[in-house]
Amino acid sequence: MLSSIAKLSSMESFELYIFSFGFATFDICSLVARAVVIMEFLLGSFLVFNLLHRFTKWITAAFLAIFSIFLLWRLIKGDTESCHCMGDVVDMNPTQSLIKNAVLAIMLAVSWKTDRCVFLRQNLIAFHIAAVTMVTVFLICPPDFYYRNTSESNDLSQEAFRPVADSLDLSEGRRIICFYSATCEHCRHCASKMAGIIRRHDIPLDSVSVLFMQTHVAQDSVVTAFYTEHGDGLVLPYHDLHPFDFIPLTNGSMPLVTLFKDGTFVKEYDYLSLDEKELASFFND
């Protein structure tokens, strides 16, 4: 239960971690992340109240085995970074998470034959707990595609940006132009999300540019750290703009991801409305 709550409190990081493996679209990874949180909370709740004890313990054992195999695979790959088993609340690497799983497995084995339940109508109680858990998770943390379907970003000042694009040679061909600040938390998440999309769909790096609002005198070192820590090491071409030049372009909103074709504005996204399918098809049409 604690693990699920920790993941829910840092859902953005958890879904980006799943997306980083590139096995599915970000939307699917968002659903997988929430499914994991829901399952962990339900299994924890059922174990605490000893509901559906036989089924719950077998499923819990299967989950521990699957996650442990995954952690062993990450260790073999040389991964020493956080596996997000406890979200961002407790930073645990694969080795530490394996130890945690071993302790949980021992606790599960000790309690295996405990089958006494003080509740009648276990199935009904379990159903209500499951329903409330699912609704709560999606209410507290809706997937990004919910916002994509309910809002549209229109923050870029195209008139103000046109001379900037011309001066930076960004007015030819099909281009993705991102507007970030290296100190903005949502920009960091957006950079990780964009890195996953670019790699998954082989989007040409020379067709993607980033405009950073300058926040430091030594901006180059700040941007390098930004790409290393939050862009999965994917270094994109970038330019720095003084805040007095940057803010009028986006009306102070960031991050923004925009599409241009030969200098003509096509589409704009904020972090939540970012559409992986549209970004990929933009270069394939």
Feature map (PLM): residue ranges:
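Short active-site neighborhood of thiol/selenol oxidoreductases, capturing the structured segment around
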Residues: 168-188, 194-196
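Functionalized membrane-embedded alpha-helices
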Residues: 1-9, 30-70
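Cytosolic-side transmembrane helix boundary signature
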Residues: 102-129
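Internal/C-terminal transmembrane anchor helices
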Residues: 119-146
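Thiol-based oxidoreductase modules, predominantly thioredoxin-like and allied folds used
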Residues: 205-223, 232-243
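Non-catalytic, surface beta->alpha helical segment in thiol-disulfide oxidoreductase systems
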Residues: 248-285
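Conserved helix-turn-beta segment immediately C-terminal to the redox Cys motif
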Residues: 191-213
